[in-house]
Structure formats: C-alpha cells, structure tokens
Amino acid sequence: MAKLTKRQKAIAAAVEANKVYTLEEAVQVLNSLPAAKFKESLDISVNLGVDPRKSDQVVRGATTLPAGTGKTVRVAVFAQGAQAEAAKEAGADVVGFDDLAESIQGGNLDFDVVIAAPDAMRVVGKLGTILGPRGLMPNPKVGTVTPDVAGAVKNAKSGQARYRVDKAGIIHAAIGQVGFDAAAIRQNVETLVADLEKLKPATSKGVYIKKITLSSTMGPGLTVDVNNVSN
C-alpha cells in the first residue's frame, strides 16, 4: 500500500467524513491545508434538480462575482467603430474585427474571454471550430454577444463565473482563490446561488438546489449546507 504524502495526511486530518459544513467552516478548512506550488482556485459545484437531456432544462449563465475571482482575465473583443473604442476604454486586451479573426486562425489564443458585438457574429461564427472546444465562443446567454461590449468587458475583468450544467445536472465554477476570506467567498457564493435560482427552468420539479460542494484545486470537496447559503 502506497504511503500517504504529507499533504494527503494533512487533508485526512482536517476533513471530517460525511460532515456537512457551514460555508465559513469549509473555507477555513480549505485555507488551512498545506499550500500547493501554485495559486489554487476555490471552486463550487452545485447539483441541480434538472434533467439536462431536456433542452428546456439546460441551465447556463454568467454571474459577476462581487468579490472577484482573484485572477487576471485577458479579454478579446470583436467590434468596430465606436464599440471598438468603448471596448478599449473599458480595458479590453485585444480589439479587432477581420484582423482579430485572422490572428485567431493563425493560432493566437492568448485570452480567457471573447466578447462580440452582434454585427461581428458573421465573422466570429466562422471561428466556431477553434473557439467552441475551448469554451471561448461568444454566446448571448452568458452576455458575451451584446451591443454593450464595454459593459461586458468590465464584467469579465471584474471577475465572472460562467457555467453550464453538465450531463449529471451539476454546474461548476471558480468562486475565488485559496486565501480569500470567508466573507468574500460568501458574497460570491450567495450571488451565484441567487442567479441560479433565477435561472430555474419552469419545468424543473422538486428540490432545485440539491447539493453544494466547495473545493480547492488540489484539495478535497467539502459538502456545504444548502440552507446556509440559499434563500
């Protein structure tokens, strides 16, 4: 039997099996674990009472997190004219139109979010095979296809959680970083959960927010009391 590493021993000592934590307790445990060699994110998984096989129960959205994510986000914008200027003023890292499409086709993908003005979708649509598999394809459902490109840039830069329910009915999102205090994580989690509740499909029956799990990149998943964060 392989020996446990120091980190694995620390995790085993810190985590109580089958315990349901308050959000503050979960953050305290994850922040107390031995640090990894990189800045770990704090991630949330929310099990929803939906059937993703049904098109009207696919929950998808974007939530602007009041305490941010702690990450530097590089944003590319497809726009021209006044919208392009507004995007630049809002802090976009790359702004272009046909030239930006050519750059992407040439392999330049040094950004985390792609935003497009509606009239740019005729150009962006041709990039689906490149942007789609990387989760970068602009979509109006998450606010990345919009005439207000400046507002979208500001939201992306300030820190957003983007999510889409997976085949198991779970959404996953980064909610901060290891080292964030519990108050900041609570702000972010409550905002995300409130948005998820607004997105509840009309055809979803029974319990909607079924389970919440908080984890760090290299750490364990801790079950959080749904009633502790849900309205």
Curated annotation (Swiss-Prot):
HAMAP family: Ribosomal_uL1_B. Gene3D superfamilies: 3.30.190.20, 3.40.50.790. One of its GO terms (biological process) is translation. Binds directly to 23S rRNA. The L1 stalk is quite mobile in the ribosome, and is involved in E site tRNA release. NCBIfam families: rplA_bact. Belongs to the universal ribosomal protein uL1 family. Disulfide bonds: none annotated. This is Large ribosomal subunit protein uL1. One of its GO terms (molecular function) is structural constituent of ribosome. It comes from Acinetobacter baumannii (strain AB0057).
